[in-house]
Amino acid sequence: MNKEVLSLLNEQIWLENTASFFYLKLSKLFSENNYFGISNFFLEQSNEEREHMLKIFSYVLEQEGEPIVPNYNFLEDEEYDFNITVLFECSLENERKVTNSINKIVSKCKEVGDYTTENFLQWFVVEQREEENKFKEILDNLKIIGNNSVGLYELNKTLNPPTTSEE
């Protein structure tokens, strides 16, 4: 595996890990403010980011590269004021950072002729477009809702669809 591509993939592992813990922290914050639906939404986002990290981690191992094992202490001291719109704006910005990082890796893969990794990353390119669009749509809804408690209640409910239990 090309050393520059490996370095970029390791940066991506770290970024996906950071995103996972960021969303986990937001899940806790929304739960503490009794927005349990939005809390569950961010818990799912955290799980998705962790899955992305593991997918890249496994790929690096399969390619006989050496993936990093990220730490998790980096968000401990960060505090966030509870403003729903601002928190979703931060989330969209987080997704944009991930998208830019993926695009940077794809560009490097093209430059060095690493078509296997470029092909592997196409799933992430599509996934990031979907993630950014999801957060843009939520922010558009928040602009319409404003501070309307009924609208916030509905958003909270919408972001926490009922689960079906299989017995």
Language model features with spans:
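Iron-associated oxidoreductase/ferritin-like identity signal
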Residues: M1-E167
